[in-house]
Amino acid sequence: MQAGLRIDVDTYRGTREGVPRLLESLDEAGVKATFFFSVGPDNMGRHLWRLIRPQFLWKMLRSNAAGLYGWDILLAGTAWPGKPIGRDLGHLMRQTLAAGHEVGLHAWDHHGWQANTGRWSQAQLIEQIRRGVDSLNDILGQAVSCSASAGWRADERVIEAKQQFGFRYNSDCRGQSLFLPRLADGSLGAPQIPVDLPTFDEVVGPVVAAKDFNSYILDRFSPDKLNVYTVHAEVEGILMANDFRQLLASARQRDIHFQPLGNMLPADLASLPAGKVVRGALEGREGWLGVQGA
């Protein structure tokens, strides 16, 4: 059974500590994945202001966020400028590419993207993407060929903004199948590879206990589904690193074969159906996010 493995790297600590452990676990399992890196300032601690929203507060409490992520992640960029991830830790991004993994852009400023996507102008959206692309291009020494919107914060405006960067594909939304998003002028944009499986933080607590998560998620892979799974360097690369190593071993026993997302594209892109990315909601995730629409 084929499956896509996507690894989101949101923070400075996730890059510095989580990525090396994930690379080690993946090498041990003989698995290649797609890493989406945040490359600008780590301002993730500014999400603490969202605690005034009941849904976000409940998510932080049920997932034991302080224990899961660590206070350095939860406070990053609050009382001091966020550390520059790409400038300080670009060598780990190059190491990821050299290890044979696919590398794409997650965001310039992960917090900024999640907090402001819905109100930024088209010019501001394009500038944020450009800063991230230029930075990651310089770090890798080659052009970035794919991207994934931070927090799945994407809609039709975001899809339009990304089109000018010539990405081979994007993974900006939640959905059930690969598709070509329809643009404002009626043409079709770069392929979308949605995520169709829940993440650890979306279900642990209200749905399943952390100790039972591996079995829970592996039971949801199916030959007749897309099977795109997302892990986070801040979770599966740090506190849950051993559990992720066990998940990779269990997946192999179940004949689940992970691969980079780019490998899931068909040879003939014209064979993909048309669709669109629209705003929607998802149980376990606070606020709006991009979902696959008809």
Swiss-Prot record:
It catalyses: 4-deoxy-4-formamido-alpha-L-arabinopyranosyl di-trans,octa-cis-undecaprenyl phosphate + H2O = 4-amino-4-deoxy-alpha-L-arabinopyranosyl di-trans,octa-cis-undecaprenyl phosphate + formate. Its EC number is 3.5.1.n3. GO terms for molecular function: hydrolase activity, acting on carbon-nitrogen (but not peptide) bonds, in linear amides. GO terms for cellular component: membrane. Pathway: Glycolipid biosynthesis; 4-amino-4-deoxy-alpha-L-arabinose undecaprenyl phosphate biosynthesis; 4-amino-4-deoxy-alpha-L-arabinose undecaprenyl phosphate from UDP-4-deoxy-4-formamido-beta-L-arabinose and undecaprenyl phosphate: step 2/2; Bacterial outer membrane biogenesis; lipopolysaccharide biosynthesis. It holds the Pfam family Polysacc_deac_1. It is an enzyme of class 3 (hydrolase). InterPro entries: ArnD (IPR023557), Glyco_hydro/deAcase_b/a-brl (IPR011330), NODB_dom (IPR002509), Polysacc_deacetylase_ArnD (IPR050248). It comes from the Bacteria. GO terms for biological process: 4-amino-4-deoxy-alpha-L-arabinopyranosyl undecaprenyl phosphate biosynthetic process; lipid A biosynthetic process; lipopolysaccharide biosynthetic process; response to antibiotic. The keyword Protein biosynthesis does not apply. Residues 1-259 form the NodB homology domain. Keywords: Antibiotic resistance, Hydrolase, Lipid A biosynthesis, Lipid biosynthesis, Lipid metabolism, Lipopolysaccharide biosynthesis. NCBIfam families: PRK15394.1. Catalyzes the deformylation of 4-deoxy-4-formamido-L-arabinose-phosphoundecaprenol to 4-amino-4-deoxy-L-arabinose-phosphoundecaprenol. The modified arabinose is attached to lipid A and is required for resistance to polymyxin and cationic antimicrobial peptides. Belongs to the polysaccharide deacetylase family. ArnD deformylase subfamily. PANTHER family: 4-DEOXY-4-FORMAMIDO-L-ARABINOSE-PHOSPHOUNDECAPRENOL DEFORMYLASE ARND-RELATED, GLYCOSYL TRANSFERASE-RELATED. This is Probable 4-deoxy-4-formamido-L-arabinose-phosphoundecaprenol deformylase ArnD.
